[in-house]
Regions:
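Conserved N-terminal subdomain of the carbohydrate kinase-like
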Residues: 1-32, 199-204
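A short, flexible beta-alpha/helix-coil linker loop
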Residues: 3, 89-91, 145-146, 164
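Flexible, glycine/proline-enriched loop segments at strand-loop-helix junctions
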Residues: 4-16, 36-43, 59-62, 94-97
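Short, small-residue-enriched loops and turns at beta-alpha junctions
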Residues: 11-14, 40-44, 71-73, 92, ...
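Active-site core of PLP-dependent enzymes with the aminotransferase class I/II
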Residues: 43-51
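Conserved phosphate/ATP/ADP-binding segment of small-molecule kinases
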Residues: 50-136
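Conserved phosphate-binding/catalytic region of the ribokinase-like
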Residues: 101-204
Length: 204
């Protein structure tokens, strides 16, 4: 089938709202996880992600960044815990076409060299690849099901991966992330727990 996505204009973010955001961020404690995802509204500084990570650089947090091109590249110096480009975004960053899993592993490795601790690359119908902080490469296939709505699937994958990391097992985290993304893609809305664990069973 065909999917049509309509993206409206985001709100104008005021200086007061930015100050409120910083105040909330200052409450983050060591061991917490912060997810920065998506594009930057035009009313915010283009380097807002960098400013946030610089502000929190003295804390031992797990920063997750799901963004594209310069927005992603410019935060690598802060050694984010996880970044999640898809295969097309990875190709855009380096100006090359990703033709194989080997290509993805090669260029994801370059992002690790630039500072990322873990690099998770989603490949739509071809599964996902994870290069973890311990130097291991993990490959995961896709779940079986009918795609109803792909919006939010990438965000669900990040959420599932982060939740899976609580076990300290990157192989499991990758599978839980994949199942979470699939559960959203196969639903009219967002993933639900029962569906996630049903799909997790497909991944072994």
């Amino acid at each position: 089938g065909e999917e049509t996505e309509l993206n409206g204009q985001g709100p104008k973010i005021t200086d007061e709202a930015i100050r409120e955001l910083y105040a909330k961020l200052d409450e983050i404690q060591d061991g917490d996880t912060l997810v920065l995802a998506g594009s930057i509204p035009s009313s915010l500084p283009a380097d807002i992600y960098e400013r946030i990570l610089e502000r929190l650089s003295g804390k031992k947090i797990r920063a997750v960044v799901d963004a594209t091109k310069d927005l992603l590249l410019n935060v690598l110096k802060y050694r984010p815990f996880l970044i999640k480009p898809n295969n097309f975004e990875l190709g855009e960053i380096f100006g090359v076409e990703m033709k194989s899993t080997e290509d993805i592993v090669k260029y994801a490795g370059k992002l690790k060299e630039m500072g990322a601790q873990n690099v998770l690359v989603s490949m739509a119908g071809d599964g996902a690849v994870l290069l973890d902080e311990n130097g291991k490469t993990h490959v995961c296939g896709v779940c079986r099901g009918k795609v109803k709505n792909s919006v939010g699937a990438g965000d669900s994958m990040v959420a599932g991966f982060v939740a899976g990391c609580e076990k300290g097992d990157y192989e499991y985290a990758l599978k839980l992330g994949t199942a979470s993304g699939g559960a959203t893609a196969f639903s009219e809305g967002l993933a639900e727990k029962d569906r996630i664990y049903e799909l997790l069973g497909q991944l072994g």
